[in-house]
Amino acid sequence: MRIILLGAPGAGKGTQAQFIKENYGIPQISTGDMLRAAVSAGTELGLKAKALMDNGQLVTDELVIALVKERIKQDDCRNGFLLDGFPRTIPQADAMKEAGINVDFVLEFAVPDEIIVERIVGRRVHAPSGRVYHIKFNPPKVENRDDVTGEELTTRKDDQEETVRKRLIEYHSQTAPLVSYYQNEAKAGNAQYHKIDGTQKVSEINAELKNILG
C-alpha cells in the first residue's frame, strides 16, 4: 500500500498520516527527515545534499528521488509507505514515475483557504512543554495561559497570518496542479485518487479512510 497525501498546510495531513501509520503498519517517509538522516549518516547521497545545502542551494529533485528509492528498499517498507511532503511539483511526480516509484492511493484533503487560516492563526503554544491550544477550537482555561503552569502562551512564527497566506499561495501555484496530474493517473488506471472533505471531524475522516484503504 503506497500512499501520497495531498493538501495545503493545515489541511490535517499530519493527523491522518498518524492514523494510517498506526492502522496499516506502514512508515511515513518525510523527505525532510530523510535528508537530515542521510546528512548525519554521511552517506554518499547525504554528502551531496550537504554540499548543496551548505552553499545555500536547494537539493535537486534527482537527489531526493535517489534518497526515496534507497529508503523504500528498506525492510519496513515491504508492505508499503506513506509519502509526506513529496512530490510537491509535477516535474517531481514525473521523475518519481520515471524512477519506477509507483503509488496505489493518492488522497487529497480539501479544506478552503479561510478555514485553514482560521485553524493555523488561532494556534497558541506553550513552548517549554510543546502543548498546543487553539483560541476557538481548544482554548486554554485562562485566556493566553498554559493550563498546567499558568505561563504565557505564544504564537509560532509559522502560524502568523502573513506566513500562512504566503504558504497557501505557494501551495496553489506549485502543488495544487498535482491534483489534476493524479486524477489523470487514476483515469489511466495507474492509481486510485480520492478527494476527502478535510473539514469533517477527525473521526469521520478516519472512517472514510478505512473505507477507502480497506
UniProtKB/Swiss-Prot annotation:
Family classification: Belongs to the adenylate kinase family.
Residue stretches in coiled coil: none
Record key words, sorted: ATP-binding, Cytoplasm, Kinase, Nucleotide biosynthesis, Nucleotide-binding, Transferase
GO aspect biological process, one term: AMP salvage
The protein's annotated pathway: Purine metabolism; AMP biosynthesis via salvage pathway; AMP from ADP: step 1/1
Subunit structure: Monomer.
MF GO annotations: adenylate kinase activity; ATP binding
Residues annotated as binding ATP: G10, A11, G12, K13, G14, T15, R123, V132, Y133, Q200
Residue ranges, annotated region (NMP): 30-59
GO CC terms, sorted: cytoplasm
This protein's domain notes: Consists of three domains, a large central CORE domain and two small peripheral domains, NMPbind and LID, which undergo movements during catalysis. The LID domain closes over the site of phosphoryl transfer upon ATP binding. Assembling and dissambling the active center during each catalytic cycle provides an effective means to prevent ATP hydrolysis.
CDD domains reported in the protein's UniProt record: ADK
Task of the protein: Catalyzes the reversible transfer of the terminal phosphate group between ATP and AMP. Plays an important role in cellular energy homeostasis and in adenine nucleotide metabolism.
NCBIfam families: adk, PRK00279.1-1, PRK00279.1-2, PRK00279.1-3, PRK14527.1
Broad class of enzyme this protein falls into: transferase
Protein name: Adenylate kinase
Entries under InterPro entries matching the protein: Adenyl_kin_sub, Adenylat/UMP-CMP_kin, Adenylat_kinase_CS, Adenylate_kinase_lid-dom, P-loop_NTPase
One Pfam family matching this protein: ADK
Classification via PANTHER family: NUCLEOTIDE KINASE
Subcellular location: Cytoplasm
Binding positions (AMP): T31, R36, Q57, L58, V59, G85, F86, P87, R88, Q92, R156, R167
Enzyme Commission code(s) on record: 2.7.4.3
Ranges where the record places region LID: 122-159
